[in-house]
Amino acid sequence: MSATTAEFFRATHEEWGVEFDFNHGLASIDGKDGRVVGVTTDDGRTLPADVVVYGIGVIPNTEIAEAAGLAVSNGIEVDERLVTSDPDISAVGDVVSFPCAQLGGAMTRLESVQNASDQARAVAARLTGDGGDYRTLPWFWSDQGHLKLQIAGVAHGYDHTVELPAEAGQKTVLCIKDGVLVAVETVNGPADHMIARRLLAERPELSPEEAAAEDFDFRAWADSRVAVGAR
């Protein structure tokens, strides 16, 4: 996610009464009579709490792969066909580090339902004789209150963002890297999201200046690129 969209959600949650405390961890979870009553931070503060929610799963579980002698680096390494260093073993999902076509083949690990499901389909197709390289465009979503965040593409390494004019309650952010549109982030904007999913696999060229121009029409521009790609 771009800093532009992340800042929007941070500010929105703060408007809803959420308080963020970044760059600190927990030293302990404090309890009394079998119930949590607070937490102590690693800088010595005590915060009252009725409920503590763990966020887990960020570190890939590669123990079985390592025991099997498979290559591991930020996940189980696979090639374009999702085959591990052992040609008889394939791997898919959040635990896999794969060459992402949208990032020029850079080894990438994605944590999303779409990626895990589509990788599984790709392996199944290959095993039944009807599959090639995994090149599916990544996309993501998150429902937060009345806001639906949808992301098409991968914004890793973007160098410019352009926020398009939008109706109240909506947002569309274009993420550009080296003059190529690499991701589109929308809030309550399903039409722009679906357009982006059709478009981004072609890695369309788009300069920040063109995207920021007052007369830039994203949907018309996207339609012209899709039409060219279909020829």
What are these regions (language model features)?
Residues M1-S28, N115, T136-W141:
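Rossmann-like dinucleotide-binding cores of NAD(P)H-dependent redox enzymes
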Residues E14, V18-E19, L70, A125-G132:
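Generic secondary-structure signature for well-ordered alpha-helical cores
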Residues D21, T40-T41, D143, I176:
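A general beta-strand register signal
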Residues S28-R35:
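Feature captures the FAD/FMN-dependent oxidoreductase FAD-binding
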Residues D30, T40, V78, C175-K177:
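Hydrophobic alpha-helical segments, especially N-terminal targeting/anchoring helices
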Residues R35-T40, R45-D118, A122:
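FAD-site-proximal beta/loop scaffold in flavoenzymes
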Residues V95-M194:
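Mid-to-C-terminal Rossmann-like scaffold of FAD/NAD(P)H-dependent oxidoreductases
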Residues E167-G229:
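C-terminal auxiliary extensions adjacent to catalytic cores
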